Amino acid sequence: MVTMEELREMDCSVLKRLMNRDENGGTAGSSGGSHGALGLLSGGKCLLLDCRPFLAHSAGYIRGSVNVRCNTIVRRRAKGSVSLEQILPAEEEVRARLRSGLYSAVIVYDERSPRAESLREDSTVSLVVQALRRNAERTDICLLKGGYERFSSEYPEFCSKTKALAAIPPPVPPSTNESLDLGCSSCGTPLHDQGGPVEILPFLYLGSAYHAARRDMLDALGITALLNVSSDCPNHFEGHYQYKCIPVEDNHKADISSWFMEAIEYIDAVKDCRGRVLVHCQAGISRSATICLAYLMMKKRVRLEEAFEFVKQRRSIISPNFSFMGQLLQFESQVLTTSCAAEAASPSGPLRERGKATPTPTSQFVFSFPVSVGVHAAPSNLPYLHSPITTSPSC
């Protein structure tokens, strides 16, 4: 077996030349994910793997790279040996190409990537390299010297970073002959309606009913579809955008988890059509945030704590009610402990079927905490609930 000391190293300048050659040839991917990786570097002959945590990758990454999944749960289950299904759960095509020897080289990087001989045996890079050597024996594996930190410093034009949203025009005061019914009785602009929808992923946005009623905001962001997670927020522009409604109340009796897979499939359908979807409820704090968290957990294979921190960095006021947090924790267990073989065979298969909606929840996912959040409560009146994730009133 080849040791870490024998792992080849690649200078940042070499990777830059490869990417520059691809750009000149028109084959480089312009975004992260498997589709970018399949077109990256010499017509898809090389694969770039980002071994950093999900939050770090989401904040900034080398264009075309694929983020591997190697969180604490994966490590604990792996007991020192991870599989391709564990580190690349949603990248079926990438796994197939690796096993078929269709990549001439795989380039791995982390935040700073010390020299190969100094890599710890239990580091993510080491575990990934070992998995590659077992499953892609004919493929050269290289370590990017200096990692993302050095490459992004020297060649920022080849990196993608989370962008601040473009300024959204302020609301236009309604005239005496024209007004817009936003479905709420509050005056002025409450906290949850200030600013615009926030980008969770390039195709996924989170906001409030007010944002969903602002066609100028939606058009400015390129929104093509809306996911309305409420039973009473109107769909204002049904002739202009695609709509889907999930009629869930924001209280401790609501079974929102029974809608997770349907919501995830809808978001994916919009993504596959190269569209963008806004997920909203009344305030964009509890119900719609819960759906976005479930999507990240399922598609990115991350823990609730990681997903929550990721979304909170973008919309600081999110606060799913206690019952929703309990359902998300149960969903986390379902997502992260499902056998890798089952994930590989059916990565988008439903974890549970959604039954007919009934006033009385029958789901085992519902945790009936004696707490509820008013559907139309203003931020100042919201009981910001404390949980293992929401630990401060500011969340």
Curated annotation (Swiss-Prot):
Expressed at moderate levels in nearly all tissues and cells including brain, spleen, and testes with the higher expression in the heart and lung and lower expression in skeletal muscle and kidney. Undetectable in liver. Expressed in many areas of the brain with very strong expression in the hippocampus, piriform cortex, and the suprachiasmatic nucleus. Induction: By mitogens and by stress. The keyword Translocase does not apply. The modification N-acetylvaline is found at residue 2. Its EC number is 3.1.3.16, 3.1.3.48. It is found in: Nucleus. Keywords: Acetylation, Hydrolase, Nucleus, Phosphoprotein, Protein phosphatase. CDD domains: DSP_DUSP4, DSP_MapKP. The active site is at 281 (phosphocysteine intermediate). Its main location: nucleus. GO terms for biological process: endoderm formation; negative regulation of ERK1 and ERK2 cascade; negative regulation of MAPK cascade; signal transduction. InterPro entries: Dual-sp_phosphatase_cat-dom (IPR000340), MKP (IPR008343), Prot-tyrosine_phosphatase-like (IPR029021), Rhodanese-like_dom (IPR001763), Rhodanese-like_dom_sf (IPR036873), Tyr_Pase_AS (IPR016130), Tyr_Pase_cat (IPR003595), Tyr_Pase_dom (IPR000387). One of its GO terms (molecular function) is MAP kinase serine/threonine phosphatase activity. The modification Phosphoserine is found at residues 387, 392. SMART domains: DSPc, PTPc_motif, RHOD. One of its GO terms (cellular component) is nucleus. Pfam families: DSPc, Rhodanese. Regulates mitogenic signal transduction by dephosphorylating both Thr and Tyr residues on MAP kinases ERK1 and ERK2. Belongs to the protein-tyrosine phosphatase family. Non-receptor class dual specificity subfamily. This is Dual specificity protein phosphatase 4. The lineage of its organism: Eukaryota, Metazoa, Chordata, Craniata, Vertebrata. The gene is Dusp4.
